[in-house]
């Protein structure tokens, strides 16, 4: 009789959980901060970050040394 009672109780608990979930899914959900402002905050942060790095890379005078083309001249060969 014990396994039968345990099975019946577990089914009752599962049904009650399913009913609670069904009730919650039908209620109106109020938007959270992330729902309201998430994309705007992400876009604003991205724009700020890109502009700060652009300023840093172009205006503060860092010598990047990206390519030696035009700056390096070959030496003349010596005949031995």
From Swiss-Prot:
Cellular compartments annotated: Mitochondrion inner membrane
Pfam family, one: COX7B
Record flagged with keyword Phosphoprotein: no
Mitochondrial intermembrane-side positions: 60-80
Self-association and partners: Component of the cytochrome c oxidase (complex IV, CIV), a multisubunit enzyme composed of 14 subunits. The complex is composed of a catalytic core of 3 subunits MT-CO1, MT-CO2 and MT-CO3, encoded in the mitochondrial DNA, and 11 supernumerary subunits COX4I, COX5A, COX5B, COX6A, COX6B, COX6C, COX7A, COX7B, COX7C, COX8 and NDUFA4, which are encoded in the nuclear genome.
PANTHER family found in the cross-reference section: CYTOCHROME C OXIDASE SUBUNIT 7B, MITOCHONDRIAL
Name this polypeptide is given: Cytochrome c oxidase subunit 7B, mitochondrial
Species in which this protein is naturally found: Rattus norvegicus
Originating gene: Cox7b
């Amino acid at each position: 009789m014990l396994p039968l009672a345990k099975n019946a109780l577990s089914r009752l608990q599962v049904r009650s959980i399913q009913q609670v979930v069904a009730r919650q899914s039908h209620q109106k959900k109020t938007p959270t901060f992330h729902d309201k402002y998430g994309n705007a905050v992400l876009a604003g942060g991205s724009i700020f970050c890109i502009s700060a790095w652009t300023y840093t890379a172009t205006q503060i005078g860092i010598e990047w040394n990206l390519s030696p083309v035009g700056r390096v001249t070959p030496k003349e060969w010596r005949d031995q």
